């Protein structure tokens, strides 16, 4: 439950960052949103892993393995979207150009925040 609350707080900070960038599209704000995304992503898979371990699952040694199991368990409903989110997270470690950073930001705004929101709702029900 503690991790779930941390995840909820992190996603709220991410949402605040997205709103700030919409109001003032400065690169420094966009980069802050990407940092918040990285943190939210880490909390999302680790919180999901903890939940699944509590359900008796094992072999959850990576983010992708964890989210695949979350899909088969019914905790998330779009496995491919979560794999895309994890791939974007991995890509953030290697951003060297504005175009890539902007592309990842756009995915955060249009897709990834809602994936986090849906996961949080499912974890509350679980």
Model-identified regions with their sequence ranges:
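Solvent-exposed interaction patches of small proteins and small membrane subunits
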Residues: 3-126
């Amino acid at each position: 439950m503690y991790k779930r609350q941390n995840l909820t707080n992190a996603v709220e900070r991410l949402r605040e960052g997205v709103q700030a960038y919409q109001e003032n599209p400065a690169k420094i704000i966009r980069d802050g949103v990407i940092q918040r995304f990285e943190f939210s992503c880490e909390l999302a898979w680790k919180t999901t892993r903890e939940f699944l371990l509590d359900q008796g699952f094992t072999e959850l040694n990576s983010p992708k393995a964890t989210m695949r199991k979350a899909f088969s368990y019914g905790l998330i409903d779009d496995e491919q979207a979560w794999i895309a989110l994890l791939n974007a997270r991995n890509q953030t470690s290697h951003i060297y150009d504005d175009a890539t950073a902007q592309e990842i930001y756009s995915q955060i705004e249009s897709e990834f925040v809602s994936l986090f929101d849906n996961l949080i709702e499912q974890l509350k029900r679980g």
